[in-house]
Amino acid sequence: MAALQKLPHCRKLVLLCFLLATLWEARAGQIRYSVREEIDRGSFVGNIAKDLGLEPLALAEQGVRIVSRGRSQLFALNPRSGSLVTANRIDREELCAQSAPCLLNFNILLEDKLTIYSVEVEITDINDNAPRFGVEELELKISETTTPGFRIPLKNAHDADVGENALQKYALNPNDHFSLDVRRGADGNKYPELVLERSLDREEEAVHHLVLVASDGGDPVLSGTSRICVKVLDANDNAPVFTQPEYRISIPENTLVGTRILTVTATDADEGYYAQVVYFLEKSPGETSEVFELKSTSGELTIIKDLDYEDATFHEIDIEAQDGPGLLTRAKVIVTVLDVNDNAPEFYMTSATSSVSEDSLPGTIIGLFNVHDRDSGQNAFTTCSLPEDLPFKLEKSVDNYYRLVTTRALDREQFSFYNITLTAKDGGNPSLSTDAHILLQVADINDNAPAFSRTSYSTYIPENNPRGASVFSVTAHDPDSNDNAHVTYSFAEDTVQGAPLSSYISINSDTGVLYALRSFDYEQLRDLQVWVIARDSGNPPLSSNVSLSLFVLDQNDNAPEILYPAFPTDGSTGVELAPRSAEPGYLVTKVVAVDRDSGQNAWLSYHLLKASEPGLFSVGLHTGEVRTARALLDRDALKQSLVVAIQDHGQPPLSATVTLTVAVADRIPDILADLGSLEPSAIPNDSDLTLYLVVAVAAVSCVFLAFVIVLLAHRLRRWHKSRLLQASGGSLTGMQSSHFVGVDGVRAFLQTYSHEVSLTADSRKSHLIFPQPNYADTLISQESCEKKDFLSAPQSLLEEEREETFSQQAPPNTDWRFSQAQRPGTSGSQNGDDTGTWPNNQFDTEMLQAMILASASEAADGSSTLGGGAGTMGLSARYGPQFTLQHVPDYRQNVYIPGSNATLTNAAGKRDGKAPAGGNGNKKKSGKKEKK
């Protein structure tokens, strides 16, 4: 009763132990199953999902698969149920031969986590193989003299099954002479022997037919048979005998072919023919006869094929010795193959990637692989390594699995790919190794902005360049690849002189070549400051910029411009004054020119091209000063014409010319007296023009006559008052004067008081001259006279009026003349002679002020011929020579006031009623004009 109570407790204890063992195996990462051989394909083996503690759906999502090496896939995973099933036919005998138990090992890989689980499946045997003999019929020869008890070894049967399904017993059919005895060998196998129970008599029965049956222990029992034919021989009653029934040797697997490994010997007690022994290898179904060879006469056992420990660890060889008549004996040779390190480790790549991003974090898994060595023992112990200078390391997992992971951040710009060499080495002596190569590409990210080769650029463009010409190119390099390295170029938005930069230059977005969109002019634009932007095509794009300075180079495209003497607007030509008393080197005038170019293109030189009197004047090469080269002579003409050329130093040089008219005279009256000689002798006769002018002048004359009468009345009234007051004239010091004074300037003052009557040289017609308003401060030459408007009038009227005018005009004051300081030249360069006189009454002062203010107003409103202000010769302060008026010239002796018998002269002359001293010369000239 107590025993019955303890029974449940024992069961619980056994169950607990089994559970603990299962948990231990699971903890150790080992899953074990058992399955019979030859079961149908798709048969259930075990529930992997349950044993791993995962749901079937999670198992499928994590990517589970079976990893095995070196054999066909025998098992498969059902992704829906998570169960392990058979995938192919399983033959235990093919997989494990006689080994027991038959264990198959493989691994389960979870690809999501790269986790390995070991699975072991035991293949259980079924009785699917019957015992088989090597030969179906065996012939034995026994001498009739053989005594009872003689044993004859028989060929044993082979059963591929193991355990109870293996060979269990032998049986011999009943007979009177033979019995069967079964012995167990050292290898555990059963070997049948035929035992002679009774003496044979050949004459009674020459041949005995026996049947040997081999049976296994399966259910049902399977068996195999072999027929034995025993022939009874005469007289030879001794069979050969081996020196030992079983031979054992051990040889390394690298033993060379042809090597003798053993010599067997059998002896026969008979003599002569009955004692001649020959040796044979017993035919067997294995590969023994293909690996070894036994020489029939010597008994030498040699190798005829390479041994391989990995294919077979030992070989069992059956040998026979037979004498002449046919008596034989058998023995066994057990050859043990010793392992040598003849197999290098092998790589089995389970999972590997060919590309990794350069921004991957350290610890990123690159690949998973297994290392296996087919050798055994220390020869199969493997280690795996890789070069130390690579940013990778190996992490060992179970069952010689390794993970290749990164150790630091990667940079594609330093290394775009890695050729990783994995080295597996075994523990043999000498050690063998195997290399595996993994080509890993580093995928690019846009982590580098384009970079210019220089921090700034500068280039030079000649002006007047053709539109669309290439002027420069910039290049930026991006160390990234593909789109991340594709650089496009553009300009930063900017304006130049109020216009967008894009209207001046453009840039090819792909090549970085800059093109000029317009022809540059150095005088308008001398440089451009541009910011060039280089942008890659990454996401997001990166950019950088660089400054580019474009300098416009000057070309000699501007001829010199003459500032002085300027071309007058009324067609007149300026006349320079040179006194006859001028010494050599006297400064007559100065030609001033500028060139809008720069540098050597603006460097000017002056040359005298032509002169009416060669050798009289010279021109400064770099100053443009016109000076007398010798003293003036009486024979020198009054009018001297000079052609001055101004040339720059460009390539090719450009030039300009100016014509100067120099009047050689000491005083203004001399010039006025000889003015007729400077006028043209003929004026083209244009009848149509004369008709229009007559009508126009007649209308203007009426208006002008009324204006003159009113103005004269007003002036006489003011003059009368000034006589009563007898106010002394104030000095006008500090007042600037123009460079030179011409007849037009005087007429601008005189035209409000009178009109002039003259005769033309080519006709007897009379002309009434109404002077046009003259805005120039220069003397009038012949060219200016051609633009006067003439109106015909009766000859008698003109002569009468002229006689009245000349009879009432007082001789001019000849005391006034230009001093050396008043002539063109540097301000204050020469001392004046102080021979001029100053106005000394109110009327004289007012007249002089009116004349100066008229000239100043003309210069101020820009109508002057030279375009300058009063007293500046029409030049700016930069270019023009600085002249100051040392003495104001007295024009009073040349001014006639209608209705008065006096002329505007100094106070002394007015009181005395005489001409001033030195006026005789001028009086004679006036007399000549009256005669004409």
From Swiss-Prot:
Record's compositionally biased regions (Polar residues): 806-841
Residue span, Cadherin domain: 29-133, 134-242, 243-347, 348-452, 453-562, 570-682
UniProt-listed SUPFAM superfamilies: Cadherin-like
Keywords: Calcium, Cell adhesion, Cell membrane, Glycoprotein, Membrane, Repeat, Signal, Transmembrane, Transmembrane helix
Glycosylation sites: N419, N545, N685
Composition skew (Basic residues), residue ranges: 922-932
SMART domains: CA
Positions on the Cytoplasmic side per record topology: 714-932
Ranges per topology, Extracellular: 29-692
UniProt main location, coarse: membrane
One GO term describing the cellular component: plasma membrane
Compartment(s): Cell membrane
Positions of the UniProt region annotated as Disordered: 798-841, 902-932
GO BP term (any one): nervous system development
Membrane topology label: Single-pass type I membrane protein
Transmembrane segments: 693-713
Function: Potential calcium-dependent cell-adhesion protein. May be involved in the establishment and maintenance of specific neuronal connections in the brain.
Name of the molecule in the record: Protocadherin gamma-A2
The species this protein was found in: Homo sapiens (Human)
